Amino acid sequence: MKARVRFAPSPTGPLHIGSIRTALYNYLFAKKYHGDFILRIEDTDSTRFIPGAEEYIIETFKWLGITFDEGPYRQSERKAIYKEYVDELLNKNLAYIAFDTPEELEAKRRNIPNFQYDAITRMTMNNSLTLSKEETKKRIANSNQYVVRIKIDPNQTIIVNDLIRGEMSISSSTLDDKVLYKSSDNLPTYHLANIVDDHLMKITHVIRGEEWLSSTPLHIILYQYFGWGEKMPVFAHLPLLLKPDGKGKLSKRDGERFGFPIFPLQWTDSKTGKSISGYREDGYLPEALINFLALLGWNPGSEQEFFSIDELSVLFSLKKCSKNGAKFDYKKVEWFNHQYIQKKSDKEIAELFFHFYSKKLEKQDFKKITEVIGMVKGRISSIRDLWYETAFFFVAPNTYDEKIVQKRWRAESPIQLTELSELLATITNFSLQIVEKTIRGWINNKGYHPSNIMNACRLALVGTAKGPGIFHIIEILGKEEVIIRIKKAIQVLR
Protein backbone atom coordinates (compact mmCIF):
# COMPACT_ATOMS: atom_id res chain seq x y z
CA MET A 1 0.00 0.00 0.00
CA LYS A 2 1.28 3.45 -0.91
CA ALA A 3 2.22 5.59 2.10
CA ARG A 4 -0.02 8.63 2.53
CA VAL A 5 0.47 11.15 5.32
CA ARG A 6 -0.98 14.55 6.07
CA PHE A 7 -0.20 17.77 7.85
CA ALA A 8 -3.42 19.21 9.21
CA PRO A 9 -3.01 22.63 10.84
CA SER A 10 -5.83 24.85 12.05
CA PRO A 11 -5.89 28.43 10.69
CA THR A 12 -5.96 29.97 14.15
CA GLY A 13 -2.77 32.05 13.95
CA PRO A 14 0.92 31.58 13.15
CA LEU A 15 2.43 28.11 13.02
CA HIS A 16 4.40 27.09 16.10
CA ILE A 17 7.90 25.83 15.36
CA GLY A 18 6.83 22.44 16.78
CA SER A 19 4.21 22.20 14.04
CA ILE A 20 6.94 22.77 11.47
CA ARG A 21 8.86 19.83 12.85
CA THR A 22 5.72 17.67 12.67
CA ALA A 23 5.18 18.67 9.05
CA LEU A 24 8.85 18.00 8.27
CA TYR A 25 8.71 14.48 9.72
CA ASN A 26 5.57 13.74 7.70
CA TYR A 27 7.26 15.06 4.56
CA LEU A 28 10.41 13.01 5.14
CA PHE A 29 8.36 9.88 5.80
CA ALA A 30 6.39 10.35 2.58
CA LYS A 31 9.54 10.90 0.52
CA LYS A 32 11.35 7.94 2.05
CA TYR A 33 8.55 5.58 1.03
CA HIS A 34 7.68 7.34 -2.26
CA GLY A 35 4.30 8.27 -0.87
CA ASP A 36 2.05 11.33 -0.79
CA PHE A 37 2.19 14.30 1.54
CA ILE A 38 -1.14 16.09 1.92
CA LEU A 39 -2.06 19.52 3.30
CA ARG A 40 -5.44 19.67 5.02
CA ILE A 41 -6.71 22.85 6.65
CA GLU A 42 -8.76 21.90 9.71
CA ASP A 43 -11.00 24.95 9.97
CA THR A 44 -14.04 23.44 11.66
CA ASP A 45 -13.80 25.72 14.71
CA SER A 46 -15.24 28.91 13.24
CA THR A 47 -14.84 30.80 16.54
CA ARG A 48 -11.04 30.52 16.37
CA PHE A 49 -10.54 31.21 12.67
CA ILE A 50 -7.99 33.98 11.99
CA PRO A 51 -7.97 35.68 8.56
CA GLY A 52 -4.64 35.29 6.81
CA ALA A 53 -3.62 32.19 8.75
CA GLU A 54 -4.04 29.82 5.80
CA GLU A 55 -1.97 32.07 3.55
CA TYR A 56 0.67 32.16 6.29
CA ILE A 57 0.77 28.35 6.35
CA ILE A 58 1.24 28.10 2.59
CA GLU A 59 3.89 30.85 2.53
CA THR A 60 5.80 29.09 5.33
CA PHE A 61 6.24 25.86 3.40
CA LYS A 62 7.02 27.72 0.21
CA TRP A 63 9.90 29.41 2.06
CA LEU A 64 11.06 26.12 3.56
CA GLY A 65 10.98 24.37 0.18
CA ILE A 66 8.61 21.68 1.47
CA THR A 67 6.07 20.80 -1.20
CA PHE A 68 2.72 19.06 -0.86
CA ASP A 69 1.49 16.41 -3.27
CA GLU A 70 -2.16 17.25 -2.61
CA GLY A 71 -4.13 20.07 -1.07
CA PRO A 72 -4.92 22.25 0.55
CA TYR A 73 -8.20 20.54 1.39
CA ARG A 74 -10.45 22.62 3.66
CA GLN A 75 -12.78 20.94 6.10
CA SER A 76 -15.17 23.90 6.01
CA GLU A 77 -15.85 23.00 2.36
CA ARG A 78 -16.76 19.40 3.24
CA LYS A 79 -19.75 19.99 5.54
CA ALA A 80 -22.12 17.71 3.65
CA ILE A 81 -19.68 14.81 3.83
CA TYR A 82 -19.36 14.98 7.62
CA LYS A 83 -23.11 15.29 8.18
CA GLU A 84 -23.63 11.92 6.48
CA TYR A 85 -21.30 10.27 8.98
CA VAL A 86 -22.87 12.06 11.95
CA ASP A 87 -26.25 10.72 10.84
CA GLU A 88 -24.77 7.24 10.47
CA LEU A 89 -23.63 7.22 14.10
CA LEU A 90 -27.02 8.51 15.26
CA ASN A 91 -28.85 5.83 13.27
CA LYS A 92 -26.60 3.15 14.77
CA ASN A 93 -27.31 4.50 18.28
CA LEU A 94 -23.57 5.13 18.66
CA ALA A 95 -24.12 8.84 19.20
CA TYR A 96 -26.87 11.02 20.62
CA ILE A 97 -28.17 14.58 20.51
CA ALA A 98 -27.56 16.81 23.54
CA PHE A 99 -29.30 20.12 24.28
CA ASP A 100 -27.40 21.10 27.43
CA THR A 101 -26.63 24.80 27.50
CA PRO A 102 -23.17 26.15 28.37
CA GLU A 103 -24.65 27.44 31.64
CA GLU A 104 -26.02 24.01 32.57
CA LEU A 105 -22.69 22.35 31.84
CA GLU A 106 -20.81 24.95 33.86
CA ALA A 107 -23.14 24.37 36.81
CA LYS A 108 -22.39 20.64 36.65
CA ARG A 109 -18.66 21.32 36.67
CA ARG A 110 -19.01 23.54 39.71
CA ASN A 111 -21.14 21.09 41.67
CA ILE A 112 -19.55 17.78 40.70
CA PRO A 113 -15.79 17.28 41.23
CA ASN A 114 -14.04 16.09 38.04
CA PHE A 115 -17.31 16.11 36.14
CA GLN A 116 -17.31 14.58 32.69
CA TYR A 117 -20.15 13.81 30.30
CA ASP A 118 -20.05 10.00 30.18
CA ALA A 119 -21.97 6.77 30.69
CA ILE A 120 -22.63 7.65 34.34
CA THR A 121 -23.75 11.26 33.95
CA ARG A 122 -25.37 11.23 30.50
CA MET A 123 -28.65 9.86 31.86
CA THR A 124 -29.00 12.89 34.14
CA MET A 125 -28.47 15.36 31.33
CA ASN A 126 -30.63 17.10 28.75
CA ASN A 127 -30.26 14.83 25.71
CA SER A 128 -32.04 12.45 23.35
CA LEU A 129 -31.33 9.54 25.70
CA THR A 130 -33.43 11.12 28.45
CA LEU A 131 -35.99 12.92 26.28
CA SER A 132 -38.69 11.29 24.18
CA LYS A 133 -38.24 11.05 20.42
CA GLU A 134 -41.10 13.49 19.98
CA GLU A 135 -39.53 16.06 22.31
CA THR A 136 -36.16 15.68 20.61
CA LYS A 137 -37.67 16.21 17.15
CA LYS A 138 -39.71 19.16 18.43
CA ARG A 139 -36.64 20.91 19.81
CA ILE A 140 -34.72 20.41 16.59
CA ALA A 141 -37.71 21.70 14.58
CA ASN A 142 -37.81 24.76 16.85
CA SER A 143 -34.14 25.44 16.01
CA ASN A 144 -32.91 24.69 19.51
CA GLN A 145 -29.14 24.52 19.35
CA TYR A 146 -27.67 21.12 20.02
CA VAL A 147 -24.54 19.04 19.74
CA VAL A 148 -24.03 15.42 18.80
CA ARG A 149 -22.00 13.42 21.30
CA ILE A 150 -20.35 10.05 20.82
CA LYS A 151 -21.81 7.32 23.02
CA ILE A 152 -18.91 5.48 24.64
CA ASP A 153 -19.55 2.18 26.38
CA PRO A 154 -17.76 1.89 29.74
CA ASN A 155 -15.41 -0.87 30.89
CA GLN A 156 -13.93 -1.53 27.46
CA THR A 157 -10.18 -1.84 26.89
CA ILE A 158 -8.83 0.30 24.08
CA ILE A 159 -5.47 -0.79 22.67
CA VAL A 160 -3.27 1.91 21.15
CA ASN A 161 -0.34 0.73 19.05
CA ASP A 162 2.16 3.50 18.49
CA LEU A 163 5.26 3.21 16.31
CA ILE A 164 7.28 5.34 18.73
CA ARG A 165 5.76 4.46 22.12
CA GLY A 166 4.71 0.87 21.65
CA GLU A 167 1.46 -0.64 22.89
CA MET A 168 -0.74 1.12 25.45
CA SER A 169 -4.11 0.14 26.90
CA ILE A 170 -6.77 2.55 28.14
CA SER A 171 -10.11 1.90 29.80
CA SER A 172 -13.04 3.47 27.98
CA SER A 173 -14.47 4.39 31.40
CA THR A 174 -11.90 7.20 31.59
CA LEU A 175 -13.22 8.79 28.40
CA ASP A 176 -16.03 11.29 28.09
CA ASP A 177 -18.68 11.49 25.40
CA LYS A 178 -16.93 14.04 23.21
CA VAL A 179 -18.86 16.45 21.03
CA LEU A 180 -18.68 15.40 17.36
CA TYR A 181 -20.96 17.96 15.73
CA LYS A 182 -22.46 21.38 16.52
CA SER A 183 -25.71 22.66 15.05
CA SER A 184 -24.66 26.27 15.69
CA ASP A 185 -22.37 26.26 12.65
CA ASN A 186 -23.28 22.92 11.04
CA LEU A 187 -19.70 21.80 11.40
CA PRO A 188 -18.13 18.75 12.99
CA THR A 189 -15.52 19.04 15.70
CA TYR A 190 -11.90 18.12 15.11
CA HIS A 191 -12.36 14.54 16.27
CA LEU A 192 -15.02 13.48 13.78
CA ALA A 193 -13.72 15.46 10.79
CA ASN A 194 -10.21 14.19 11.43
CA ILE A 195 -11.24 10.54 11.36
CA VAL A 196 -13.56 10.85 8.37
CA ASP A 197 -10.98 12.72 6.32
CA ASP A 198 -8.14 10.38 7.22
CA HIS A 199 -10.28 7.45 6.09
CA LEU A 200 -11.57 9.02 2.87
CA MET A 201 -8.12 10.34 1.97
CA LYS A 202 -6.63 6.89 2.59
CA ILE A 203 -4.11 8.13 5.15
CA THR A 204 -1.84 5.24 6.10
CA HIS A 205 0.16 6.87 8.92
CA VAL A 206 -0.89 9.57 11.37
CA ILE A 207 2.30 11.28 12.53
CA ARG A 208 1.52 14.02 15.02
CA GLY A 209 2.56 15.59 18.32
CA GLU A 210 2.41 13.90 21.69
CA GLU A 211 -0.37 16.27 22.78
CA TRP A 212 -2.78 14.24 20.60
CA LEU A 213 -1.94 10.93 22.28
CA SER A 214 -4.77 11.34 24.80
CA SER A 215 -7.28 11.71 21.93
CA THR A 216 -6.17 8.54 20.18
CA PRO A 217 -8.43 6.11 22.14
CA LEU A 218 -11.45 8.19 21.07
CA HIS A 219 -10.24 8.13 17.48
CA ILE A 220 -9.83 4.35 17.59
CA ILE A 221 -13.38 4.00 18.90
CA LEU A 222 -14.64 6.14 16.01
CA TYR A 223 -12.82 3.93 13.52
CA GLN A 224 -14.49 0.91 15.10
CA TYR A 225 -17.93 2.53 15.16
CA PHE A 226 -17.70 3.26 11.43
CA GLY A 227 -16.51 -0.27 10.70
CA TRP A 228 -13.07 0.90 9.60
CA GLY A 229 -11.04 -0.85 12.28
CA GLU A 230 -9.16 -3.00 9.76
CA LYS A 231 -8.22 0.05 7.68
CA MET A 232 -7.14 2.23 10.59
CA PRO A 233 -3.88 4.14 9.99
CA VAL A 234 -0.73 3.51 12.00
CA PHE A 235 -0.15 6.07 14.75
CA ALA A 236 3.13 7.73 15.69
CA HIS A 237 3.19 10.43 18.36
CA LEU A 238 6.25 12.65 18.31
CA PRO A 239 7.97 13.92 21.47
CA LEU A 240 7.24 17.42 22.70
CA LEU A 241 9.55 20.34 22.07
CA LEU A 242 10.57 21.62 25.50
CA LYS A 243 11.60 25.04 26.75
CA PRO A 244 15.38 25.63 26.73
CA ASP A 245 15.50 24.87 30.46
CA GLY A 246 13.55 21.65 29.92
CA LYS A 247 10.72 22.80 32.18
CA GLY A 248 7.56 22.26 30.18
CA LYS A 249 6.39 22.43 26.59
CA LEU A 250 7.75 25.20 24.39
CA SER A 251 4.89 27.69 24.03
CA LYS A 252 4.19 30.58 21.69
CA ARG A 253 4.91 32.99 24.55
CA ASP A 254 8.39 31.62 25.17
CA GLY A 255 9.85 33.51 22.24
CA GLU A 256 9.55 36.83 24.03
CA ARG A 257 10.62 35.30 27.33
CA PHE A 258 13.79 33.67 26.01
CA GLY A 259 14.49 36.08 23.17
CA PHE A 260 14.24 33.88 20.06
CA PRO A 261 11.61 33.23 17.37
CA ILE A 262 8.90 30.62 17.91
CA PHE A 263 7.39 31.09 14.46
CA PRO A 264 8.89 30.35 11.02
CA LEU A 265 7.71 33.68 9.57
CA GLN A 266 6.85 37.01 11.10
CA TRP A 267 3.24 37.28 12.25
CA THR A 268 1.30 40.52 12.66
CA ASP A 269 -1.77 40.47 14.88
CA SER A 270 -4.62 41.99 12.86
CA LYS A 271 -6.32 43.30 16.01
CA THR A 272 -3.40 44.83 17.89
CA GLY A 273 -1.03 45.45 14.98
CA LYS A 274 1.75 43.89 17.02
CA SER A 275 4.34 41.97 14.99
CA ILE A 276 6.18 38.92 16.27
CA SER A 277 9.43 38.00 14.57
CA GLY A 278 10.01 34.83 12.57
CA TYR A 279 13.09 32.89 11.49
CA ARG A 280 12.87 34.15 7.91
CA GLU A 281 12.79 37.80 8.97
CA ASP A 282 15.59 37.18 11.46
CA GLY A 283 17.83 36.12 8.59
CA TYR A 284 17.86 32.34 8.94
CA LEU A 285 18.36 30.02 6.00
CA PRO A 286 15.53 27.51 5.53
CA GLU A 287 17.96 24.62 5.06
CA ALA A 288 19.62 25.42 8.40
CA LEU A 289 16.28 25.48 10.21
CA ILE A 290 15.23 22.19 8.61
CA ASN A 291 18.51 20.53 9.60
CA PHE A 292 18.12 21.75 13.18
CA LEU A 293 14.48 20.68 13.50
CA ALA A 294 15.13 17.25 12.01
CA LEU A 295 17.45 16.46 14.92
CA LEU A 296 14.95 17.52 17.59
CA GLY A 297 13.54 14.14 18.51
CA TRP A 298 15.19 12.01 15.81
CA ASN A 299 18.70 10.58 15.79
CA PRO A 300 20.33 9.17 12.66
CA GLY A 301 22.49 6.86 14.77
CA SER A 302 25.74 8.45 13.62
CA GLU A 303 27.97 11.43 14.41
CA GLN A 304 26.88 13.25 11.25
CA GLU A 305 25.27 16.64 11.94
CA PHE A 306 24.71 18.21 8.54
CA PHE A 307 22.00 16.84 6.26
CA SER A 308 20.36 18.09 3.12
CA ILE A 309 16.63 17.51 2.93
CA ASP A 310 17.26 14.78 0.34
CA GLU A 311 19.66 13.01 2.70
CA LEU A 312 17.13 13.29 5.51
CA SER A 313 14.41 11.73 3.38
CA VAL A 314 16.61 8.68 2.84
CA LEU A 315 17.75 8.29 6.45
CA PHE A 316 14.62 9.27 8.37
CA SER A 317 12.93 6.55 10.40
CA LEU A 318 10.14 6.80 12.96
CA LYS A 319 11.79 3.94 14.84
CA LYS A 320 14.70 6.27 15.61
CA CYS A 321 12.45 8.95 17.08
CA SER A 322 12.69 9.48 20.81
CA LYS A 323 9.84 9.16 23.30
CA ASN A 324 11.30 11.90 25.46
CA GLY A 325 10.86 15.61 24.91
CA ALA A 326 13.62 17.53 23.13
CA LYS A 327 14.98 20.78 24.59
CA PHE A 328 14.86 23.65 22.15
CA ASP A 329 18.44 24.94 22.10
CA TYR A 330 18.35 28.29 20.32
CA LYS A 331 22.14 28.59 20.38
CA LYS A 332 22.23 25.40 18.35
CA VAL A 333 20.00 26.77 15.60
CA GLU A 334 22.20 29.88 15.54
CA TRP A 335 25.22 27.61 15.15
CA PHE A 336 23.60 25.68 12.32
CA ASN A 337 22.73 28.90 10.54
CA HIS A 338 26.30 30.17 10.90
CA GLN A 339 27.64 26.93 9.44
CA TYR A 340 25.26 27.00 6.49
CA ILE A 341 26.16 30.61 5.76
CA GLN A 342 29.85 29.66 5.67
CA LYS A 343 29.09 26.89 3.18
CA LYS A 344 27.63 29.34 0.68
CA SER A 345 29.72 31.41 -1.71
CA ASP A 346 30.14 35.14 -1.18
CA LYS A 347 27.98 35.72 -4.25
CA GLU A 348 25.16 33.53 -2.91
CA ILE A 349 25.17 35.34 0.44
CA ALA A 350 25.35 38.69 -1.35
CA GLU A 351 22.22 37.78 -3.32
CA LEU A 352 20.40 36.87 -0.11
CA PHE A 353 21.64 40.05 1.57
CA PHE A 354 20.56 42.17 -1.39
CA HIS A 355 17.09 40.61 -1.32
CA PHE A 356 16.86 40.94 2.47
CA TYR A 357 17.73 44.64 2.44
CA SER A 358 16.60 45.52 -1.08
CA LYS A 359 15.45 49.04 -0.20
CA LYS A 360 18.67 49.93 1.59
CA LEU A 361 20.89 48.38 -1.06
CA GLU A 362 18.99 49.17 -4.27
CA LYS A 363 21.55 51.76 -5.43
CA GLN A 364 24.62 49.78 -4.40
CA ASP A 365 27.02 48.00 -6.73
CA PHE A 366 26.56 44.22 -6.46
CA LYS A 367 30.29 43.61 -6.87
CA LYS A 368 30.95 45.87 -3.91
CA ILE A 369 28.37 44.00 -1.83
CA THR A 370 30.04 40.68 -2.70
CA GLU A 371 33.46 42.00 -1.68
CA VAL A 372 32.06 43.23 1.63
CA ILE A 373 30.43 39.85 2.32
CA GLY A 374 33.75 38.09 1.87
CA MET A 375 35.31 40.15 4.65
CA VAL A 376 32.62 39.69 7.32
CA LYS A 377 30.92 36.37 6.51
CA GLY A 378 32.91 34.44 9.09
CA ARG A 379 31.59 36.58 11.91
CA ILE A 380 27.85 36.38 11.28
CA SER A 381 25.14 33.95 12.36
CA SER A 382 22.29 35.32 10.26
CA ILE A 383 21.69 37.38 7.14
CA ARG A 384 20.23 40.09 9.35
CA ASP A 385 23.59 40.35 11.17
CA LEU A 386 25.16 41.42 7.90
CA TRP A 387 23.61 44.87 8.02
CA TYR A 388 24.93 45.44 11.53
CA GLU A 389 28.39 44.35 10.42
CA THR A 390 28.47 46.15 7.08
CA ALA A 391 26.09 49.13 7.16
CA PHE A 392 28.99 51.60 7.26
CA PHE A 393 30.11 50.41 3.82
CA PHE A 394 26.85 51.67 2.34
CA VAL A 395 25.82 54.51 4.65
CA ALA A 396 28.26 57.06 6.09
CA PRO A 397 28.11 57.39 9.89
CA ASN A 398 26.02 60.27 11.22
CA THR A 399 27.32 59.88 14.76
CA TYR A 400 30.50 58.67 16.38
CA ASP A 401 30.74 56.32 19.35
CA GLU A 402 31.46 58.58 22.32
CA LYS A 403 33.48 56.00 24.21
CA ILE A 404 35.63 55.32 21.17
CA VAL A 405 36.04 59.06 20.51
CA GLN A 406 37.35 59.58 24.04
CA LYS A 407 39.66 56.61 23.69
CA ARG A 408 40.88 56.88 20.08
CA TRP A 409 40.46 60.50 18.91
CA ARG A 410 43.51 62.49 19.95
CA ALA A 411 44.30 66.22 19.89
CA GLU A 412 46.53 65.75 16.87
CA SER A 413 44.01 63.55 14.98
CA PRO A 414 42.48 66.40 12.91
CA ILE A 415 45.88 67.48 11.60
CA GLN A 416 47.01 63.93 10.90
CA LEU A 417 43.78 62.97 9.10
CA THR A 418 43.88 66.16 7.05
CA GLU A 419 47.34 65.13 5.88
CA LEU A 420 46.06 61.62 5.21
CA SER A 421 43.16 62.84 3.07
CA GLU A 422 45.56 65.00 1.04
CA LEU A 423 47.82 61.98 0.60
CA LEU A 424 44.94 59.76 -0.55
CA ALA A 425 43.91 62.37 -3.12
CA THR A 426 47.26 61.89 -4.87
CA ILE A 427 46.88 58.12 -5.34
CA THR A 428 45.83 57.22 -8.88
CA ASN A 429 45.78 53.41 -8.54
CA PHE A 430 43.51 52.94 -5.50
CA SER A 431 44.19 49.22 -5.03
CA LEU A 432 44.62 47.57 -1.63
CA GLN A 433 48.36 47.04 -2.08
CA ILE A 434 49.11 50.57 -3.30
CA VAL A 435 46.93 52.21 -0.64
CA GLU A 436 48.52 50.23 2.19
CA LYS A 437 52.06 50.78 0.92
CA THR A 438 51.50 54.52 0.48
CA ILE A 439 49.91 55.05 3.90
CA ARG A 440 52.51 52.99 5.75
CA GLY A 441 55.33 54.83 3.98
CA TRP A 442 53.81 58.18 4.93
CA ILE A 443 53.42 57.10 8.58
CA ASN A 444 57.07 56.01 8.74
CA ASN A 445 58.31 59.21 7.11
CA LYS A 446 56.32 61.39 9.49
CA GLY A 447 57.23 59.32 12.55
CA TYR A 448 53.59 58.91 13.55
CA HIS A 449 52.42 56.05 15.72
CA PRO A 450 50.59 53.64 13.34
CA SER A 451 47.81 52.74 15.78
CA ASN A 452 46.93 56.39 16.37
CA ILE A 453 46.43 56.94 12.63
CA MET A 454 44.58 53.67 12.04
CA ASN A 455 42.24 54.10 15.03
CA ALA A 456 41.34 57.69 14.15
CA CYS A 457 40.84 56.76 10.50
CA ARG A 458 38.57 53.82 11.41
CA LEU A 459 36.51 56.08 13.67
CA ALA A 460 36.11 58.59 10.82
CA LEU A 461 35.10 55.94 8.27
CA VAL A 462 33.02 53.59 10.44
CA GLY A 463 31.84 55.70 13.37
CA THR A 464 33.07 53.14 15.88
CA ALA A 465 35.87 50.62 16.40
CA LYS A 466 34.41 47.63 14.54
CA GLY A 467 34.97 46.30 11.05
CA PRO A 468 37.55 44.38 9.01
CA GLY A 469 41.06 45.59 8.22
CA ILE A 470 41.26 49.35 7.73
CA PHE A 471 42.98 49.08 4.34
CA HIS A 472 40.22 46.81 3.06
CA ILE A 473 37.66 49.37 4.23
CA ILE A 474 39.53 52.20 2.49
CA GLU A 475 39.81 50.26 -0.78
CA ILE A 476 36.13 49.27 -0.91
CA LEU A 477 34.81 52.69 0.07
CA GLY A 478 36.93 54.28 -2.64
CA LYS A 479 39.00 57.44 -2.67
CA GLU A 480 36.23 60.02 -2.93
CA GLU A 481 34.06 58.51 -0.19
CA VAL A 482 37.01 58.07 2.18
CA ILE A 483 38.06 61.71 1.78
CA ILE A 484 34.48 62.92 2.31
CA ARG A 485 34.13 60.88 5.51
CA ILE A 486 37.49 62.00 6.88
CA LYS A 487 36.64 65.66 6.30
CA LYS A 488 33.23 65.22 7.93
CA ALA A 489 34.74 63.55 11.02
CA ILE A 490 37.32 66.33 11.37
CA GLN A 491 34.56 68.93 11.19
CA VAL A 492 32.33 67.16 13.73
CA LEU A 493 34.99 66.01 16.20
CA ARG A 494 37.46 68.93 16.06
Curated annotation (Swiss-Prot):
A motif ('KMSKS' region) lies at residues 249-253. A motif ('HIGH' region) lies at residues 9-19. GO terms for cellular component: cytosol. It catalyses: tRNA(Glu) + L-glutamate + ATP = L-glutamyl-tRNA(Glu) + AMP + diphosphate. It holds the Pfam family Anticodon_2. Its main location: cytoplasm. Keywords: Aminoacyl-tRNA synthetase, ATP-binding, Cytoplasm, Ligase, Nucleotide-binding, Protein biosynthesis. One of its GO terms (biological process) is glutamyl-tRNA aminoacylation. Monomer. Belongs to the class-I aminoacyl-tRNA synthetase family. Glutamate--tRNA ligase type 1 subfamily. This is Glutamate--tRNA ligase. The lineage of its organism: Bacteria, Pseudomonadati, Bacteroidota, Bacteroidia, Bacteroidales. The gene is gltX.
